[in-house]
Structure formats: structure tokens, C-alpha cells
A protein has these predicted regions:
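Long, contiguous binding/interaction regions
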Residues: 1-99
Length: 99
């Protein structure tokens, strides 16, 4: 029997509007900050921050899986860009039959 080793990774995903896309939420926040006396704030952009854990055989496999998640659901790639960081959260775990 073979033993399969897996690793759990923690993903921090940052989704932001593309620079060419207007950001009405950012404009509203910037205006609100100005009304509160923060006149030195400019270029406010609002985005999304997502955290999740994924189990994979390798770091490359985890990266590919998170990349697909972002492309398919977590980001609207027509108007948003994304980037992510992955860090291991557990020691690798062996699964399967052992002799």
C-alpha cells in the first residue's frame, strides 16, 4: 500500500477592483472621511479579503486550487484582480494504509 502525505495551507486572498473600474463605494468612503475631517485621504478603493484553509499534496497543488477558486467564484475577473498568499498550517499528514 502507498501512503499519501497531505498538507493543510491557509490562504489569504485579496480581491480588488481593476484600476480602470469606477469604485462608488470607495468614493463614498472617501467623502465620508472628508466630512469627518480627514481631508488628506485620497484614492480610496474598496475590496474583499477572504481567508480559507485548503488541504493539498503540494504547495503547487494548493496554489492551483486556490487560483481556480478565485477564477470561478471568489473574484469577478472581468472587473476585479486578485492575489493570494499561502502558508502551511499543520505538519504534513500521512493517509492510507501503512505496514
Amino acid at each position: 500500500m502507498t501512503t499519501k502525505v497531505t498538507q493543510q495551507y491557509h490562504a489569504k486572498i485579496y480581491v480588488t477592483l481593476r484600476p480602470s473600474v469606477l469604485d462608488p463605494a470607495g468614493t463614498a468612503v472617501q467623502s465620508g472621511l472628508g466630512h469627518l475631517g480627514y481631508d488628506n485621504v485620497a484614492q480610496v478603493r474598496i475590496g474583499k479579503y477572504i481567508e480559507l484553509n485548503v488541504t493539498a499534496d503540494t504547495l503547487a497543488a494548493a496554489e492551483a486550487q486556490v487560483d481556480r477558486m478565485c477564477d470561478q467564484l471568489l473574484a469577478n475577473t472581468v472587473i476585479e484582480n486578485y492575489r493570494f498568499d499561502l502558508t502551511p498550517v499543520t505538519e504534513p499528514t500521512a493517509t492510507g494504509a501503512q505496514r
